Amino acid sequence: GDVYKRQAFTLHVGGEANGEFAGHAFHWDVPGAIGLELVRRLYRLGFDPAFTSTAKVDYAIGIPLTHLGHQGSVLPIFVNAYLPPQPTMERCYAFGQAIAQSLTAMGVRTIVLASGGMSHYPGTDRYSQPALEWDTNALARLKDGNLKSLLGYDEVELDDTGNIELRCWACAAGALGQRKPDIVALEPSWHHNYASLGWFTPTPPVSDFHYPSIQPELVALTTALHQIAH
């Protein structure tokens, strides 16, 4: 399907997004003007995402939003997690940072939702062998707020452990920054490990450094005190 025709990153900028999966029809309004402005700003920040007005919303977006009962507008962003060459985890994380920076500059507040399962191998002889130990260890690092731990996984490890969809997680991690999740859940199955993380606590203020920078108006005083002390 369309999932195999994506560039690294694609934004939906049409007025609405529709789709269907397993008999369930999906429909959400899309803030196209915001989407186009976001594309422009991402270009200026060194990213070249594609954009579409007609792409269908599949289960990866439709199911999570349906379970959440979301009925407001949605700005779908598609990530090529499947077809090599895929974007690196570093690039996905930086893309998330650029999205957050752009939306903040635009004065837009939003909820970030990333969809992608942990280890699974659909269509292969490893379908019944999800990597539970790997998933558990990876999730433990995220539970501690170490979202940058995702950057340590290269394309070989992601492919070998069936975790190619963590590229979507890396995009969300870049947008969120280093934060401990409020909710962490892991639900293993015989063919696919499901995990969920959620953040709803406001970002804490940045703590003062033990060695703060010198305020410009205090340079002369600081220099004099240093000379007296030595």
Protein language model regions, located:
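Short, small-residue-biased leader/transition segments that mark boundaries at the very start
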Residues: G1-Y4
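Acidic, low-complexity central loop/insert segments
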Residues: E16-T54
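Glycine-rich phosphate- or other oxyanion-binding loops that anchor nucleotides, phosphorylated ligands
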Residues: T52-M106
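Active-site beta-strand/loop microenvironment that shapes enzyme catalytic pockets
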Residues: P87-W134
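Gly/Ser/Thr-rich active-site loops/lids in small-molecule metabolic enzymes
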Residues: R126-L150
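Polyanion-binding loop/helix "lid" in catalytic or ligand-binding cores
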Residues: R141-L186
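Long, Lys/Arg- and hydrophobic-enriched amphipathic alpha-helices
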Residues: Q178-P212
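Short, basic/aromatic recognition patches
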Residues: S213-A229
